[in-house]
């Protein structure tokens, strides 16, 4: 039988020790003898680190909260394990998750072998189509508006299980999004090939992670996985979706999707990521889409702030793009 690779599992915590403990418990019992679980506490300052250590977890403390990407990079620093596995602190891994996620990465690195794998992430709870005017709903342009049913109704089997992600896609305006978002789980039969990984539950070979220098830290949060997926693709590396590796995710437990901070950072990072990787028409589409949102939408303030921050960062992204192409050309020349 093929030996499965060793794994370092990294979970990032910020002021949500109990959620993080739940996530850690779900994956800890799946670890093999060569695997390591590392919890990064992003300067919570609320006693989280001490609470996590009482669970006999390995905790690495950051001196400041520099965002999700920086937290993962800190947790992965110095790793000797063969694969880095990421699990959101507000997710729970089903039994067999780790074994299934690592299976496509068991073969030695080769041109045809995938460099990363992304899990089947389901939304926690059960959901039903939302009533007209109902608030606190999730929306998909493909499947409509959904409201979560209460725990009692869920225990009776009411509602449906919905997909959160089967990987990452990018549209014509540079918007990174989850494939199969809010598709009923029983209807999801997506292919294994996918553009990119979802950072909420995924795995990447150590060699690929090191070659790419991990996540971009200046994005702080959101779009780190889209940016990393772009860089994997630009190197010619594949990402595969593993349907058997299942995790359940409490959507937006760590930061609400309607908060001004979420909107500002999302707008900024979408444009910056498009500028770093996409063709010029996509960058223009991203800018145009944001201008339309600014004029029409109710969240003008944070959208405008995010747009201004993105425009200020465009020269840096174009330089990054040029340097990246030069590095890839140099690497290609070395291997010819």
What are the functions of these language-model segments?
Residues 95-164, 168-175:
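Conserved donor NDP-sugar-binding/catalytic core segment of glycosyltransferases
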Residues 84:
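Short aromatic/hydrophobic "clamp" motif used to bind/position activated sugar donors
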Residues 239, 258-282, 301-317:
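Catalytic core of nucleotide-sugar-dependent glycosyltransferases
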Residues 26, 41-49, 64:
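A conserved acidic beta->alpha catalytic loop
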Residues 62-79, 89:
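Glycine-rich, basic loop-to-helix element that forms the pyrophosphate-binding segment
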Residues 25-34:
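Short, acidic, metal-binding catalytic loop of nucleotide-sugar glycosyltransferases
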Residues 195-246:
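A short, conserved alpha-helix in the catalytic core of glycosyltransferases
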Residues 282-336:
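Non-catalytic, C-terminal membrane-associated alpha-helical segments of glycosyltransferases
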């Amino acid at each position: 039988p093929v030996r499965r690779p060793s794994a370092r599992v990294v979970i990032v915590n910020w002021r949500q020790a109990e959620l993080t403990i739940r996530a850690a418990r779900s994956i800890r019992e799946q670890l093999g003898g060569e695997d390591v679980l590392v919890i990064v506490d992003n300067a919570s300052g609320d006693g989280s680190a001490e609470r996590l250590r009482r669970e006999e977890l390995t905790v690495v403390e950051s001196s400041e909260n520099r965002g999700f990407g920086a937290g993962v990079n800190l947790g992965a620093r110095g790793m000797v394990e063969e694969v880095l596995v990421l699990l959101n602190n507000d997710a729970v891994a089903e039994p067999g998750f780790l074994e299934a996620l690592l299976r496509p990465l068991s073969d030695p690195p080769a041109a045809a072998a995938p460099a990363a794998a992304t899990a089947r992430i389901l939304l926690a709870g059960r959901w039903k189509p939302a009533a007209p005017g109902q608030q606190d709903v999730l929306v998909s342009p493909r499947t409509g508006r959904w409201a979560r049913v209460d725990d009692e109704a869920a225990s009776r089997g009411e509602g449906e299980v919905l997909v959160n992600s089967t990987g990452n896609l990018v549209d014509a305006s540079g918007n990174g999004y989850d494939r199969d978002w809010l598709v009923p789980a029983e209807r999801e039969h997506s292919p294994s090939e996918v553009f990119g990984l979802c950072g909420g539950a995924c795995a990447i070979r150590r060699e690929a992670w090191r070659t790419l220098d991990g996540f971009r830290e200046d994005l702080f949060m959101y779009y780190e996985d889209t940016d990393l997926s772009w860089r994997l693709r630009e190197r010619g590396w594949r990402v595969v979706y593993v349907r058997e590796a299942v995790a359940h995710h409490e959507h937006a437990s760590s930061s609400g999707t309607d908060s001004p901070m979420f909107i500002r950072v999302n707008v900024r990072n979408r444009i910056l990521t498009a500028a770093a990787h996409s063709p010029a028409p996509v960058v223009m589409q991203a800018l145009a889409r944001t201008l339309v949102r600014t004029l029409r939408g109710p969240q003008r303030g944070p959208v405008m702030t995010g747009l201004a921050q993105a425009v200020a960062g465009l020269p840096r992204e174009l330089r990054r793009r040029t340097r990246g192409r030069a590095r890839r050309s140099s690497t290609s020349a070395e291997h010819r």
